[in-house]
Amino acid sequence: MEKILVTFSTGAASIAVLAVLFTVPSLYNTINEVHDQVLDGVSVFRVETDSAWTEMMDIQITVTPPTKPRVNPFNSVFRQKRQTFSGLPAWCQCEPTKPTCPPGPPGPPGQPGAPGTPGAPGPKGDDNTATFAPLTCAPVSQDCVKCPQGPAGPAGPSGPAGPAGPDGQPGFPGQRGNDGFPGAPGAPGDNGQPGTPGQDGFPGQPGADGQRGSGAPGAPGAPGNAGPAGPAGQDGFPGQDGAPGPAGPAGQDGFPGNAGSDGQPGAPGGPGLPGNDAAYCACPPRSAVFLSRH
């Protein structure tokens, strides 16, 4: 009993160790995939927020009158780090694109703020003499998106069987079969009717007187030879038909029929699935890109 328990425990422990060895790499790969997906999502989110922030700043600059840019007082003390993108691949576009469309309609008015303290009256400003060219957008293309053809749909179901073909020409007559074995002799027929009695013969001459014998009677003689066979009787009535014999063996299989006609073509396949999203490249931090442009 103890040997059985030890063997069972050892087998269970071995199975558990093997399960752990096969499960840990799978969990590690799953965690790495989730980590990569999270990093990709964060990168996409940062790119979208940078683009939105840049568009908001451009709209604000377009709507509000141009003012003198604010100078960073620490530029004279600390040297600004130079941004370079020469180490990135050619397909990476890390700098935010500048919008070329006019600003949208103004948003709803916000909540009124608290009244501030009245400021001192400023000097009279100069008349504005600068003019700006109107902003125009590139024409929007109305062409349809040309997608690649989807994969072929599954094959349609088989069509119904075609109608049976016409009967063929009649075959040549077969050869005459061999004679069968002679039948068993029939049962003997019934006895025939008795014949008519013959005519009486003429009376014979009277015999001579015999002598009285004196001896004892002798032994009986041997039986005589059999007489000739009598005439054959009439044929008997035909016997009843015998019981049917057992069924013969099955004949050979017939020739295969002609192939049926092809079925109707299947329905066209559905539209293909959309392609995977394009991969994003790692971009520098938003603050450095924004400061380099503004």
UniProtKB/Swiss-Prot annotation:
UniProt keyword Disulfide bond, yes or no: yes
Pro residues compositional bias, start-end: 100-112
Keyword Transcription carried by entry: no
SMART domains to which the protein is assigned, alphabetical: Col_cuticle_N
Location of region: Disordered: 100-133, 148-276
UniProt xrefs under Pfam families: Col_cuticle_N, Collagen
UniProt keyword list: Collagen, Cuticle, Disulfide bond, Repeat, Signal
A GO cellular-component term linked to this record: collagen trimer
InterPro entries in the record: Col_cuticle_N (IPR002486), Collagen (IPR008160)
Region (Triple-helical region): 102-127, 148-277
PANTHER family in UniProt: COLLAGEN, NEMATODE CUTICLE COLLAGEN N-TERMINAL DOMAIN-CONTAINING PROTEIN-RELATED
Family named by the database record: Belongs to the cuticular collagen family.
Quaternary organization: Collagen polypeptide chains are complexed within the cuticle by disulfide bonds and other types of covalent cross-links.
Described function: Nematode cuticles are composed largely of collagen-like proteins. The cuticle functions both as an exoskeleton and as a barrier to protect the worm from its environment.
Name recorded for this polypeptide: Putative cuticle collagen 145
Organism: Caenorhabditis elegans
